[in-house]
Amino acid sequence: VPMIPQQGKESLPHPEAIPVSRRSVPLLGSIACGEPIFADEDYSVSVALGHDVDCDFALRCKGDSMIEARIYDGDIVFIKKQDFVDDGTIAAVLIDDDATLKRVYKLSDGRIELRAANERYRPIFVGGPDDTRTFRVLGKAVAFQSTIL
């Protein structure tokens, strides 16, 4: 809490200061915002955030495929673990051993479309009849912390 220095007295809390409750979640590594990259987990690093953010872990974004959603290279995205997400939700997903952050859409033919928020990137389709890759939703993006000022 910011303090107001008082001459000859102990400092007093600033009258407009709002106390913020913080906690830490593991920063598990990086996630692709571009082409999927190998998913590695490192539980030794954590990142602080407010108690009001309901998430289980964080990932550092690599790439520019989500810039139209205001998620930039180097940003930290906070993920709430869940197996399914609603259409259009930004989610961390795993394709085989590669993780990526994209908007997720379920198509009428049963496939999943993973759509970037940058028109320079083509959608990724998974789950077709000839697709032997494994696909899993890791969780929903619930917040992000930007390094851009």
Where are these regions (language model features)?
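Well-ordered beta-strand positions enriched in small/hydrophobic/aromatic, beta-favoring residues
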Residues: 59, 91-93, 114
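Short, Lys/Arg- and Gly-enriched loop/turn segments at beta-strand edges
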Residues: 84-92, 100-101
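Short aromatic-glycine motifs in intrinsically disordered, low-complexity regions
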Residues: 92-94, 122-132
